[in-house]
């Protein structure tokens, strides 16, 4: 009888166990990359399998067109402009005491810890570089990675990789492209600036302690993620894996460079090596979940933090206009995938607009967690299981300094002035013009007025930036 009671208790516990949550975040991966997005040049079978076994969102957005602000929205479930987080700390300004996710904001990890989850982050943080903002003080039980905006995958002297770096001036003077005698180091002036000093005062950390990492960083992040799954397979866990791939610096591991010898453009070949490496890493995480019999009790999200910076990396946003840093579709619409085997239909293409804010709302609903503060996202599960046939969002909003946009239904109004330009508004109908080539603002002035009014109404609920960007 005692054995039967124990067996019953264990069985009930397993049945009622909360689902694990795995959030895989690529860095600077454009909408036009991935096999499941229609690009067959660089095979990505493991990432594609998430779409095959679940849902691919054709209109998946993020809350900002660059790294830090986008992550602030993702991890709080609220438009980051609600709490004044609007820009990107870079270089030494990651250490500014005010340049971090406000301590008043609860992260997804904070909420899930209180719901009984073990939480881990392995990769890039970029939500504050000082001790107050360290992930282990923001709800994460474990952290392995770095705090700033970027990091070398392999530090100088760049062993085992081919490295492409930006330079304002080539070694010896001049512009164009310079290649070392062994063909393993390339400098290019095509961007007109020099590669940031990513690793300065930005060590790899385990919790709060610096460690030396001899392994290519994508592989190291994956190693730590797999270890986390191994050690926590018997409890609900939240695994957040913000890869720094395919963010610069461009560094392709030798084994992956060989796979893409057919790509003649060396810049594109390095990018391909980095993306394929990340795909294999995602595959290793998925395989670990399968080997632990966790796949059917694990919700998996995959998305990018913003659109691709095409000139810098070759990261494609096709067929969308422009890319990272802009409020055109190429800056805000990203690869966006979700899997929960046995719970949401597989091979699903979901065509209504969703946004990264929804991952927070979905996750806390699955965790049966409580949060008093209102969220800007929605639980996606009812929409993917046909319990709710409406649209998750009628209106989406963006503000990035003087760049701003609103999407309402199929209409999008935006202002994307370059430095020194005055504020002007452009209007596009996205169903008819996904590439935003036909500005309809002069023909539909009533629609411009309507959307301006809606943007102003939403913006009135936001606050001014609590800190301003600085350059080194």
Predicted regions and their residues:
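Sec-dependent signal peptide recognition
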Residues: 1-6
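N-terminal signal peptide c-region/cleavage motif recognized by signal peptidases
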Residues: 9-11
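Formylglycine-dependent sulfatase
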Residues: 14-426, 430-472
């Amino acid at each position: 009888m005692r054995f039967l009671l124990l067996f019953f208790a264990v069985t009930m516990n397993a049945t009622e166990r909360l689902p694990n949550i795995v959030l895989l975040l690529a860095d600077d991966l454009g909408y036009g990359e991935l096999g499941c997005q229609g690009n067959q040049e660089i095979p990505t079978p493991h990432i594609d399998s998430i779409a095959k076994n679940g849902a691919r969102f054709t209109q998946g957005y993020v809350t900002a067109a660059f790294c830090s602000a986008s992550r602030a929205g993702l991890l709080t479930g609220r438009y980051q402009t609600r709490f004044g987080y609007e820009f990107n700390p870079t270089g030494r300004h990651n250490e500014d005491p005010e340049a971090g996710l406000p301590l008043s904001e609860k992260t997804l990890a904070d909420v899930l810890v209180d719901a009984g989850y073990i939480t881990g982050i392995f990769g890039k943080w970029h939500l504050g570089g000082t001790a107050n903002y360290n992930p282990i003080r923001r709800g994460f039980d474990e952290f392995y990675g770095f705090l700033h905006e970027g990091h070398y995958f392999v530090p100088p002297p760049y062993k085992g990789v081919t490295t492409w770096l930006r330079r304002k001036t080539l070694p010896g003077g001049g512009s164009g492209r310079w290649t070392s005698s062994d063909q393993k180091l390339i400098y290019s002036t095509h961007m007109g600036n020099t590669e940031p000093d990513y690793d300065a005062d930005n060590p790899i950390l385990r919790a709060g302690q610096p460690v030396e990492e001899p392994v290519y960083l994508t592989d190291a992040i994956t190693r730590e993620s797999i270890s986390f799954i191994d050690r926590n397979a018997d409890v609900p866990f939240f695994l957040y894996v913000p890869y720094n791939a395919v963010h610069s610096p461009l560094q392709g591991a030798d084994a992956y460079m060989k796979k893409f010898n057919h790509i003649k453009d060396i810049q594109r070949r390095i990018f391909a090596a980095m993306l394929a490496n990340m795909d294999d890493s995602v595959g290793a995480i998925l395989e670990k979940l399968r080997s632990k019999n966790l796949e059917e009790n694990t919700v998996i999200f995959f998305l990018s933090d913003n659109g691709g910076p095409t000139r810098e990396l070759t990261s494609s946003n096709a067929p969308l206009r422009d890319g990272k840093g802009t409020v055109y579709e190429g800056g805000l619409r990203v690869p966006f995938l979700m899997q929960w085997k046995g719970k949401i239909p597989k091979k699903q293409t979901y065509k209504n607009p969703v946004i990264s804010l929804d991952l927070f709302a979905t996750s806390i609903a699955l965790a049966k967690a409580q949060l008093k503060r209102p969220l800007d996202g929605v639980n996606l599960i009812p929409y993917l299981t046909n319990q709710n046939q409406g649209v998750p969002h009628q209106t989406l909003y963006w503000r990035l300094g003087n760049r701003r946009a609103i999407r309402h239904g199929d209409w999008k109004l935006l202002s994307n002035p370059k430095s020194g330009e005055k504020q002007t508004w452009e209007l596009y109908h996205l169903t008819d013009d996904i590439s935003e080539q036909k500005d309809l603002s002069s023909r539909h002035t009533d629609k411009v007025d309507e959307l301006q009014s809606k943007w102003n109404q939403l913006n009135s609920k936001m606050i001014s930036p609590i800190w301003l960007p600085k350059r080194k």
